[in-house]
């Protein structure tokens, strides 16, 4: 899967009349990586770092949709399942945001995120523990037990038993994950989860630190230019969680293009 990342230097070379939000922008195609930071060199030689503000679970879900379109149904189910796991991780960070950043959106000390990352890698990297942490924090936030999408049976058959799902099974699985994420996003938006939900870039910063620690890479000091690519899931847009387009409709529209 390739991402089209805009070159901001090229963008500012465009005439004023071509800088609208819907205008074509010069982009650099990059293979999907394991962090949200991409160092790019465009065709004009501009070098810059792009900070992709799409969340990892959104990108992984899009990867599943692309696999569906190309009729790779095992890969689609795997991507959807992993996207849901990363959504739980996103939610955990979201619930803990006030522990990481103050009301002025300033990080609470330089060691706050690295310490949490070490705790995460040592304790919460197993999916069962992540779900347990998510449920506990959700109950604390909303006072009710979260309704989870039961994806374990098909997921385990596909990943551990080499099962090849049908197109319908993969579509139904993807739609189930989509509806689950959408309902949680709507819930978060309605309450604004104690204020930090709108601060998507700060959730993303915490996620980047976790990714870097997982990969044993140096923590970034330069996040670069913020950019976003259009994807099926956009957890910070009410047009997504109040919309009605299905995974099947989206895949069909991609096939027409």
Feature-to-residue mapping (PLM):
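Short, hydrophobic, well-ordered secondary-structure elements
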Residues: 61-95
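Short, charged amphipathic alpha-helical segments flanked by flexible coils
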Residues: 92-142
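N-terminal cysteine/histidine-rich coordination modules
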Residues: 1-66
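Short, charge-rich amphipathic alpha-helical segments embedded
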Residues: 84-104, 185-190
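Mixed-charge (acidic/basic) macromolecular-recognition segments
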Residues: 77-86, 112, 116, 123-135, ...
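Charge-enriched, short contiguous segments at helix-coil
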Residues: 136-257
